[in-house]
A protein has these predicted regions:
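Loop-to-helix entry region at the N-terminal start of transmembrane alpha-helices
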Residues: 78-86, 136-157, 200, 242-249
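Periplasmic/extracellular loop-to-transmembrane helix junction in inner-membrane transport proteins
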Residues: 13-25, 49-92, 232
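Short helix-to-coil transition segments within interhelical loops
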Residues: 165-171, 175-195, 224, 236
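Cytoplasmic-entry segments and transmembrane alpha-helices of multi-pass inner-membrane transporters
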Residues: 99-135, 159-166, 174
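Transmembrane alpha-helical segments of polytopic membrane transport and secretion proteins
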Residues: 1-35, 259-273
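Transmembrane alpha-helices
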Residues: 147-151, 184-216
Length: 273
């Protein structure tokens, strides 16, 4: 009887809508929204009280007016599209290059020993230092910005692919080999699908970094994206409200991309379970 009670209790507790687990799960979905609204409310109070000068912290109403004006005339939307295009192309190129590279590092100790140190060293070079070199080598416009994004995203994609392949259950791989799976079939049907959650986590992190790389590239190499909008807001007469409006667009893009790729990752995990 005691054993039955112990077995039933957890299931009842999990199913109860008022249980701590259930309440915590519901709160987890709304926590980011509550936190964001709290920050905006605090910002509004500080601006209304005049604690900080407007050139340091503009009023949320001024930022909203600038943001809405930029969206209404299409300027900020067009800039966001340009930045997303460069970031997306860079992330795509990094994925195409990083997947086979990460797989090779995972499966070949020689490749890992040869390329590993250089991949780590590439992360020591800041994007601001690379951008002027790309201008000299390639020029201005979309292509050098895409190359910069590719370089930035490459490392997390390679590392996540390497870890995903190395952590596979070797018994599953050996069983597939015993069933007659060749190398290509093994990669396509077993290894990459099982490593997909780890790979998607790396791409999710990389895409967020890619947006940052696109903005830095646009500030240095020109263009019509959000980086150019930030540069214009930094002019001799700094438009702080415009800077905050562009930053708000960047935050929205980063959060949206993160949530979308997180959802894709969850769907992939459910499909594999």
């Amino acid at each position: 009887m005691g054993e039955t009670r112990q077995a039933v209790a957890p299931s009842v507790r999990d199913a109860c809508p008022l249980s701590p687990n259930h309440a915590g799960g519901q709160l987890r979905h709304f926590a980011p929204i509550i936190f964001g609204l709290s920050i905006i409310a605090l910002w509004w109070v500080v601006a209304d009280m005049g604690i900080l000068p407007t050139y340091f912290l503009p009023h949320p109403r001024a930022v909203w007016d600038t943001l809405w004006s930029g969206i209404a005339d299409g300027y900020l939307l067009s800039a966001a599209r340009e930045t997303l295009l460069a970031a997306g192309l860079g992330c795509l190129a990094a994925t195409i290059i990083g997947l086979p590279l990460g797989y090779s590092i995972a499966r070949s100790p020689i490749v890992a020993a040869t390329l590993g140190p250089y991949l780590a060293a590439s992360q020591a070079i800041p994007a601001v230092a690379l951008a002027p070199l790309l201008v000299v080598w390639i020029g201005y416009g979309l292509v050098p910005i895409t190359v910069l994004c590719t370089i930035i995203v490459m490392f997390p994609v390679v590392i996540s692919t390497t870890l995903g392949i190395r952590e596979l259950d070797q018994d599953i791989v050996d069983a597939a080999r015993l069933d007659g799976a060749g190398r290509l079939d093994l990669v396509r049907s077993i290894e990459l699908p099982l490593a997909a959650p780890a790979i998607l986590a790396g791409i999710r992190t990389g895409f967020t970094l890619s947006v940052t790389g696109a903005v830095v590239g646009e500030m240095v190499m020109g263009g019509d994206g959000l980086g150019a909008a930030l540069s214009r807001g930094q002019g001799s007469t700094a438009n702080v409200a415009q800077l905050f409006a562009v930053i708000a667009i960047l935050i929205i893009l980063a959060v949206g991309i993160y949530l979308l790729l997180t959802y894709v990752e969850k769907i992939t995990r459910k499909g594999l379970s």
